[in-house]
């Protein structure tokens, strides 16, 4: 999307500064010189997401790699969403203004259950098929983490990969694997099967879930040999060695 196209609608929405990017310490790169593009999506308003420490850490961590570019994405307010749909403007990354449907990864943080519908709405607004089974290509790969990922079943039909536990290490391992898959031309299924062998990674399509009559889960069983029977939560063993940013993006509006 061109910035001129965005500027035509900004006067008709509240708090337009949340949609333009370019804040102090936001990270800009040449998209022609990066090999992997990631959209870090917070399924809530800009002022909520910009106050979240986990997003700040992972945003900076991903961008430590020169050939990776992680951009921020937030759920637009109702007025902005209406105009985006009317003008056929897909959900975009704040740094480049490019549609996130063209990215390699679409990453969601699941901080609370009330955000689940926002996740689905953001996928739809991006022009990405909502259900995982309808996304057959390697990219975009839809990944979700955060505290609510420990109970993934309510949104298992929509997410390709869940990150269970602390994400600073496993997210990098997963992205490194994706880079190998992209280079060697793997299909989506092969990548998911290999990703399932990383500790803390749960791939719902590789498991069969059965339910009791009262709606509670009866069993979760792997449906392929690559999927472990039990997915272990990833924990950072030494917090003194964990990555922490030296500077944060300074928001344009009060948060």
Predicted features along the sequence, with ranges:
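N-terminal [4Fe-4S]-dependent radical SAM core
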Residues: 9-39, 46-47, 215-255
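Structural motif at membrane-water interfaces of alpha-helical integral membrane proteins
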Residues: 38, 55-56, 70
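A short beta-strand-loop structural module common to alpha/beta enzyme folds
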Residues: 67-79
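Histidine-anchored nucleotide/phosphate-binding helix
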Residues: 24-29, 54-64
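Helix-enriched interaction subdomains in cytosolic or periplasmic regions
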Residues: 1-15, 65
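Glycine-rich beta-alpha loop elements in corrinoid/cobalamin-binding modules
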Residues: 76-224
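A short, glycine/small-residue-rich beta-strand->loop->alpha-helix junction that serves as a flexible
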Residues: 45-53
């Amino acid at each position: 999307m061109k910035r001129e196209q965005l500027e035509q609608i900004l006067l008709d929405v509240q708090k337009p500064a949340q949609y333009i990017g370019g804040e102090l310490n936001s990270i800009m790169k040449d998209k022609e010189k990066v090999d992997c593009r990631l959209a870090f999506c917070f399924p809530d308003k800009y002022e909520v997401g910009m106050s979240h420490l986990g997003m700040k850490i992972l945003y900076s961590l991903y961008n430590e790699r020169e050939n990776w570019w992680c951009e921020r994405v937030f759920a637009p307010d109702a007025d902005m969403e209406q105009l985006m749909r009317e003008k056929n403007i897909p959900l975009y990354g704040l740094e480049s203004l490019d549609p996130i449907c063209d990215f390699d990864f679409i990453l969601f943080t699941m901080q609370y259950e009330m955000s689940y519908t926002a996740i689905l709405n953001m996928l739809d607004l991006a022009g990405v098929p909502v259900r995982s089974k309808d996304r057959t290509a390697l990219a975009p790969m839809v990944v979700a983490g955060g505290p609510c990922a420990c109970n993934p079943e309510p949104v298992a039909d929509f997410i390709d990969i869940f990150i269970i536990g602390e994400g600073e290490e496993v997210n990098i391992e997963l992205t490194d694997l994706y880079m190998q898959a992209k280079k060697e031309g793997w299909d989506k299924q092969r990548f998911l099967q290999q990703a399932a062998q990383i500790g803390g990674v749960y791939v719902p399509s590789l498991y069969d879930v059965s339910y009791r009559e009262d709606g509670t889960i009866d069993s979760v069983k792997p449906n392929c040999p690559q999927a472990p029977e039990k997915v272990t939560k990833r924990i950072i063993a030494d917090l003194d060695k964990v990555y922490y940013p030296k500077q944060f993006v300074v928001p344009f509006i009060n948060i």
